[in-house]
UniProtKB/Swiss-Prot annotation:
It comes from Streptomyces avermitilis (strain ATCC 31267 / DSM 46492 / JCM 5070 / NBRC 14893 / NCIMB 12804 / NRRL 8165 / MA-4680). This is Tryptophan--tRNA ligase 1. Catalyzes the attachment of tryptophan to tRNA(Trp). Keywords: Aminoacyl-tRNA synthetase, ATP-binding, Cytoplasm, Ligase, Nucleotide-binding, Protein biosynthesis. It catalyses: tRNA(Trp) + L-tryptophan + ATP = L-tryptophyl-tRNA(Trp) + AMP + diphosphate + H(+).
Length: 331
């Protein structure tokens, strides 16, 4: 049985992009015979300035939304990264086979470091080594497949390189994973800046649809979405990013392809209206389940506790084997 691992970082409220590009896909894979682990990667949220209380609150909210989206703890493992010490243990070993040059070539590091410096802040070492911890997250479980968006593909490629390098130097220890991506909506873009990702870490704004937005707020954001200078509804990511983003969102909500849907609309207004309603209907059952789960906090805590216990049982033997392989004495 193949093993799947993926995670979500609690740096902001989960967005439509997180759902279409990640969480909904998790619900699909965990029902089809895969051994799937889904994680709130809270350690990754500490790489920038943060409010501790907010990280805890967003971690709990992310876990609740994952369950509300349809993840079944009877069929998959849902847990919090910091509850499983093996992630941090293995991360140091991965640092011992990674190079400084590899870390500095990571696109996300360069972009985030540049933004931090523009704000006059200092860049934390943990931001540079973020991909190493991500590699440890993946490799600790013998992961075969990692469902990711386009922006994380480079990190999975690094994970593959580190696994191969470790295996060559110290003996076969790790499964070499591969990234999997959805055909549609792998990267939902900001409705006001359609060349930028709809990121949960961004400031609150009209271009971001959050999973817990009220229906009227969703409609308002979609109807005010930036389109393009042309008048025809044409799917072309390069020259028509605004309308293409709406078509991809609609296709992800209702099925079909963006190209086929483009031929069904004669105006931007009609496309926006249908897209807005499709998003509202997509989020409605998730929001209802989220409300019900919030009324049972003990249930969510129990799921996370049981998930962490199983995750430790899976990760510990492989991490212990890596410690032996690299030359460390057994305790």
């Amino acid at each position: 049985m193949k093993r799947i691992f993926s995670g979500v970082k609690p740096t902001g409220h989960l967005t439509l992009g997180n759902y279409l590009g990640a969480v909904r896909r998790w619900v699909d894979v965990d029902q089809h015979g895969a051994d799937a682990l889904f994680c709130v990667v809270d350690l990754h949220a500490l790489t920038v300035d943060h409010d501790p209380a907010r990280v805890r609150r967003l971690s709990r909210q992310a876990a609740t939304l994952m369950l509300a989206a349809g993840l079944d703890p009877e069929l998959c493992t849902v847990f919090v990264q910091s509850h499983v010490d093996e992630h941090a243990r293995l991360s140091y070993l991965m640092e011992c086979v990674a190079t400084d040059g590899e870390m500095r070539r990571m696109i996300q590091y360069r972009e985030k470091a540049a933004r931090e410096q523009q704000r006059g802040g200092s860049v934390r070492l943990s931001l540079l080594t973020y991909p190493v911890l991500m590699a440890a997250d993946i490799l600790a479980y013998g992961t075969d497949e990692v469902p990711v968006g386009d922006d994380q593909t480079q990190h999975v490629e690094l994970t593959r390189d580190l696994a191969v390098r470790f295996n060559q130097r110290y003996g076969h220890t790790f499964v070499v994973p591969r990234a999997t991506r959805p055909e549609v909506a792998a990267r939902v873009m900001n409705l006001q800046e359609p060349t930028s990702k709809m990121g949960k870490s961004d400031d609150v704004g009209p271009g971001i649809v959050y999973l817990l937005d009220e229906p009227e707020a969703v409609r308002k954001k979609v109807m005010r979405a930036v389109t393009d200078s042309g008048r025809d509804v044409v799917y072309d990511r390069e020259s028509r990013p605004g309308v293409s983003n709406l078509l991809e969102i609609l296709a992800a909500c209702e099925g079909g392809s963006p190209e086929a849907l483009s031929g069904a609309y004669a105006s931007y207004g009609a496309l926006k209206k249908d897209t807005a309603e499709a998003v509202v209907e997509l989020l409605r059952p998730l929001q209802e389940r989220h409300k019900a789960l919030c009324a049972e906090p003990g249930y969510v805590e129990g799921v996370l506790r049981d998930g962490a216990r199983r995750a430790r049982e899976l990760a510990r033997p492989r991490v212990d084997a890596a410690y032996r392989a690299i030359g460390l004495l057994e305790a």
